[in-house]
């Protein structure tokens, strides 16, 4: 959890926002996935948001569903994902690492055992996409026992009660939805969200990172101007992977230039 605090303090001092890419672990295979993650970090990613392959990702659009399918086709298991996480942490000791999960995968070996394993491999936060705030007690309690930040989604239509709950229960960062629906670069995030960001700050919530439909540098700078602490981009990154499956080196080169441009926009 401290890695997020340190990151946001440093970015604050430099007057810049965070750029956080999302990819699915093991897409399109373990070896290339590790190279992708190294490339994202080298190109300027401030933190990572990583998915563990899941057969029925409800919140995700077709791009990220296909990433899950590619990882499954490569035979990637949750156990291998944790081995990958340990390698990533060993190589990159300071970068915050967040997982985006679905409840079934957390339940699989018991909630506490899941968060204990996260702590062991150096994960900083977990967002369980299909568990609403009001059902989150066993997850967030286990998370805090193991020094893992529980992350909550703040939707664009959040009422005051939900804003207060998200502020009270969340740690690390707050996942601010640009809009409702499923993820995807086609559905571009609609700004501004000033009022939500102001309210979250008023209730002392963890810093807000805006996600869903973030696919251009302009959207990153707009999120930062609206008061968000940064932006998360998933589908746009995964599309670059999908487009270059036949040419791994070209894939890494395109990822590098995309992330560099997105990070540069966080300094605007």
Swiss-Prot record:
Signal peptide: none
Gene (UniProt): trpA
Superkingdom as given in the UniProt entry: Bacteria
GO MF term set: tryptophan synthase activity
Keywords: Amino-acid biosynthesis, Aromatic amino acid biosynthesis, Lyase, Tryptophan biosynthesis
Alphabetical list of Pfam families matching this protein: Trp_syntA
Functional summary from the UniProt entry: The alpha subunit is responsible for the aldol cleavage of indoleglycerol phosphate to indole and glyceraldehyde 3-phosphate.
Pathway assigned to this chain's UniProt record: Amino-acid biosynthesis; L-tryptophan biosynthesis; L-tryptophan from chorismate: step 5/5
Reactions it catalyzes: (1S,2R)-1-C-(indol-3-yl)glycerol 3-phosphate + L-serine = D-glyceraldehyde 3-phosphate + L-tryptophan + H2O
A GO cellular component entry from the record: cytosol
Subunit structure: Tetramer of two alpha and two beta chains.
Organism whose genome encodes this protein: Salmonella paratyphi B (strain ATCC BAA-1250 / SPB7)
UniProt entry tagged with the keyword Amino-acid biosynthesis: yes
NCBIfam families: trpA
Name of this protein: Tryptophan synthase alpha chain
SUPFAM superfamilies to which the protein is assigned, alphabetical: Ribulose-phoshate binding barrel
């Amino acid at each position: 959890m401290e890695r997020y605090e340190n990151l946001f303090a440093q970015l604050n001092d430099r007057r810049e926002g965070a750029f956080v890419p999302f990819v699915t672990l093991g897409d399109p295979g373990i070896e290339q996935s590790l190279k992708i993650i190294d490339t994202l970090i080298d190109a300027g990613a401030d933190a990572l948001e990583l998915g563990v392959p899941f057969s029925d990702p409800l919140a995700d659009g077709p791009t990220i569903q296909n990433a899950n399918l590619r990882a499954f086709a490569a035979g990637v298991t949750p156990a291998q994902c944790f081995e990958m996480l340990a390698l990533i942490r060993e190589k990159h000791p300071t970068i915050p690492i967040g997982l985006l999960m679905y409840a079934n995968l957390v339940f699989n070996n018991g909630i506490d055992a899941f968060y204990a394993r996260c702590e062991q491999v150096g994960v900083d936060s977990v967002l369980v996409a299909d568990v609403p705030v009001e059902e989150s007690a066993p997850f967030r309690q286990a998370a805090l026992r193991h020094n893992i930040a529980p992350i909550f989604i703040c939707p664009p239509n959040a009422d005051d009660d939900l804003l207060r709950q998200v502020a009270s229960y969340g740690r690390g960062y707050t996942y601010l939805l640009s809009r409702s629906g499923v993820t995807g670069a086609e559905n571009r995030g609609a700004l501004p969200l000033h009022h939500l960001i102001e309210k979250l700050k008023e209730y002392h919530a963890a810093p807000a990172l805006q996600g869903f439909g973030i696919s251009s540098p302009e959207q990153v700078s707009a999120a930062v101007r609206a008061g968000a602490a940064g932006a998360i981009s998933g589908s746009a990154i995964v599309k670059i992977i999908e487009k270059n499956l036949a040419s791994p080196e070209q894939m890494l080169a395109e990822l590098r230039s995309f992330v560099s441009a997105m990070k540069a926009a966080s300094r605007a």
